[in-house]
A protein has these predicted regions:
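C-terminal catalytic lobe of FAD-dependent flavoproteins
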Residues: 121-184
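Mid-domain catalytic core of redox enzymes
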Residues: 2-135
Length: 184
């Protein structure tokens, strides 16, 4: 959806294909910065003040089979493996973690499959299955305070907001907050 126009009782939206649709309610199940971008000039000051508090950082993400991005001792492997960070002294760089998908998602696969965020050295090229960039919320005192204020926006103008950013960033929180929207 692009260019939503909120009215007293309905929301008129221009779809990405140019079609115009009218809705009683719209649920923004996306990052708050994306919701503000969609709302554009129609975002209220209250929406800007509350959901505008959430900032995101990019994370270079690899799905791969390279065991070199895991702890050296296999006995130390867990579902989530904090490897360190990819920063030089005095630099602020993102955390480097590797998820062991076979354990995390109970994959019954003969090859160990991993997801690494922000590795200091990328996986070996022949072991990369996919590379992408994801953004993750950066929690600050302002964003934590804003989480409590999102409830004040729910249903105002027929718009609702939900997502993992309303809690600790986990998918389960996203599901819970989506469910709560449908209970309103």
């Amino acid at each position: 959806m692009t260019d939503p126009v909120t009215g007293a009782d309905v929301i008129t939206a221009v779809e990405t294909n140019g079609a115009v649709s009218v809705y009683d309610n719209v649920v923004f199940a996306c990052h708050p910065d994306q919701a503000l971008e969609i709302l554009g000039v129609d975002a209220t000051q209250k929406e800007k003040d509350v959901i505008g508090c959430f900032k995101y950082s990019p994370n270079n993400t690899y799905v791969h089979t390279d065991k070199a991005l895991m702890p050296k001792a296999k006995s130390a492997w867990t579902s989530w493996n904090y490897i360190g960070n990819s920063k030089a002294v005095g630099e602020e760089k993102p955390v480097f973690v590797t998820y062991w998908l076979n354990k995390l998602q109970k994959l019954n696969h003969p090859t160990d499959i991993f997801v690494s965020l922000n590795p200091s050295t990328p996986p070996a090229a022949d072991k990369i299955l996919q590379k992408m960039v994801y953004t993750h919320p950066q929690y600050t005192q302002d964003s934590v305070r804003a989480q409590k204020k999102v409830v004040e926006l729910q249903g105002d103008r027929g718009t609702y907001f939900c997502g993992a950013w309303m809690g600790y960033g986990f998918h389960e929180v996203s599901y819970l907050n989506t469910f709560r929207v449908f209970l309103i």
